[in-house]
Amino acid sequence: MANPTLIGALCALTFCGTLQAQTLTIDIPAGALQPALDQYARQTGVQLLYRAEDVQGRQSDGVRGQLDPGRALDALLAGTGLAVRRDGGAVMIFREAAGPSTAGNRDQGTELNTVTVTAQKRSQSAQDVPIAMTALSARTLETHRVQNLQDVARLTPGLLVSAFSQANPTIAIRGVSNTFSQIGVNKPVGVFVDDVFIPRNSAASFELFDLESIAVLKGPQGTLFGRNVTGGAIVINTRRPDTERIAVEGEIIAGNHGERQAKGLVNLPLGDGAALKISASSRQRDGTGRDRLTGREQDDIDSQNIRAQALVRLAPGVEATFSADYGDDSNGGRTLSSDTLGADGDVRTSELGVNQDYQRTIKGISARLAWRLAAGELTSISAWRRSASSEDYAGVGASYTFLTSGSQSVTRDEDEITTFSQELRYASPKWAHGNVVTGLYFSDEDGARRLGVRALAARTGALASATLAEQQVDSRSAGVFADGIVHLAPVVDLTLGARYTRDRKSASLVRSDLLRPASNFSVSALRNTWNEVTPRAVLTWRPAAGLMTYLSATRGFTSGGYNADASSATAFRMPFDPETVDNYELGLKSQWLHNRVRLNASVFHMKYRDKQELVNNTQTGILTIFNAGKATVDGSEIELAVKPASWLDLSANFAYLDGRYDRFVVGTVNNSGNPMSNSPRRQAGIAADLRYPVSFGYLVGAASYAWKDSYNTGAANDPNLQLPAFGLANLSAGVESPDGTWRLLAWVKNTNDTAYLLTRSTQVVRARYVGEPRTFGLSLTGRF
């Protein structure tokens, strides 16, 4: 063990002086704790004293951003079961039992994890950001086996993820969503991966692996994230390459329904501040559903993903991160099960008689350049992405052989989206009186879609209609934004920001009807431009350490567009307007008992103007996107986290939502006063995870339960589209080696085997689509 007197003297000269100095730019990725502490010492100049056996095998969530060394060290050690003692300038790290706890020492062993987020385009602790959010660390994502956005929703109050088809998942935050599938039509919840916007939900439903954090930002984020975030944003940060150590990690999973999965990564330091990391995932699973007419499996999984990242120090203070990713997914479609004609009473079988199929590829490259200067930081993010998908599915929940009238629709839906985006922003240092972030943004999106629909007549299967819609929508968006914080007093901040966005869309549609050629039409070169200013104002008060309250007013907007699914030229030529949301919010973020208890809460009031909804116009009989007029959403959310011991984390959350259409009249139908679609009134969840030390290593485990209230999926409040309330429980338990190099885990999802509904359908017959059944298995993880 090193000489404590010598270390104490060094710390007195370095650490204490650094604490009083200007904040430092610190960048330490999530991973093993010992190399993280070594990087901390190099980046801060602080000398640390610890025993190797105390830190071996422990993991850290990392830290990134402009922080003082003391707070950065707290963040690195949070949740590790280690404590920090500062005595006479010395900085000593030890197990809880290794030394006494005094009133002047913070007990790091029972502190909750600190999650670093970029919600304000800076790296900050989630507790320091005056925005309602749920922030999930790398440790939480791994512990609770988060593999997709539906798993994220289990741990996030106010987030709903469901689907009618594989290519068109629905994502709602605080009830803000839409179910549009047309090309060039925007969603009100934005998904961002490493600050790159994913323009279509079908490209956002990918396998989640090798992540640093996920933050779900709630409410409009129009100032810093631009258009199409009226409901909020899901910000996904991948783990960056580590320039300090060679690392190999892997996990093998096997389970019921033929589940087999392998994922892993290799990290290679290249010297001179450069590193390369390659991570990959491959997953296969047999179908959990079956079409009893064709015998084909449905809801199976066949997914492969790979990501490569290179970090290069181009010059002192200049860093570049280059990324490339590729994903390929396929399955046999979803199990849309009839509960009327042809039904056999089993929700895991369908009566479609159609060879459903889903194929998708996504790929992208990006370059992130950061210049750290004395006058601030300049960041450039350039990205190119392409997604292509095709899906064959039955839109009616029963084969034509069971129908007594009408017809069975069979759809082939193909789309391809190519996007280039460029963001350039400046972040000032933390000046005495505040700081500012400002920047420019541009995106160019080209979207093409071929939508073919055949109608098979009842009983006979004769071709009743056959239409093909070839859609093309090109979108250009440019924006300029600024967001600044002014310190009005030592404990009071005022944040003011605004963004100006200009969207231009051009659209074309060629629609042909094989049996009724007289109805064919072609419309090209439709163009429209929409401009919007989205401001933000936040008043923040920090009356005590670990306590923050905020009052905010924000605006978001979802861009306008064209009804590319229109069945008449007149309907296509008529654009719909943008929707805007003004959000007024009062929030609290607090930490108690030396960060053993965390309590966050918010109440909000949202006012919609021109809300976009897909409804059937009773006067024309055409399914069209309309601006619904006005709507109001009131709600509240609360999240509680407690760490009663170094080996145990507990959490609970609750969300309340009351959203209604104030004015919404379409043709002869008045939807005013109806509840908003995809808006469960109540959501609640509890979770626990443990890492208990024993003689042979650690006992590890996690448990969670998430409950959602009943809600309707349509604006007309059709009782046939009402989904019942449900709750899901997940469990895992296992053992981990003393040094953390391996872990064996048994897990089960949907423990009670609940047949919960993702959606209902009323096309010709009533039908339903249920979520995954109970799944269970084993996983073996290794880290070297």
Where are these regions (language model features)?
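Structural signature of Gram-negative outer-membrane beta-barrels, strongest in the C-terminal barrel
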Residues: 311-315, 426-429, 433-435, 441-443, ...
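Outer-membrane beta-barrel translocator/receptor signature
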Residues: 186-188, 200, 209-215, 223-291, ...
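Membrane-embedded beta-barrel scaffold of Gram-negative outer-membrane proteins
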Residues: 368-396, 542, 548-558, 575-636, ...
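Gram-negative outer-membrane beta-barrel transporters
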Residues: 427, 437, 487-494, 503, ...
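Outer membrane beta-barrel strand-and-loop segments of large Gram-negative receptors
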Residues: 404-428, 467-469, 473, 477-481, ...
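Conserved C-terminal beta-signal and adjacent last beta-strands/turns
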Residues: 267, 417-439, 584, 677-784
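Outer-membrane beta-barrel domain signature, strongest for Gram-negative TonB-dependent receptors
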Residues: 271, 295, 299-436, 443-445, ...
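Periplasmic N-terminal gating module of Gram-negative TonB-dependent outer-membrane receptors
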Residues: 39, 68-75, 104-115, 124-169, ...
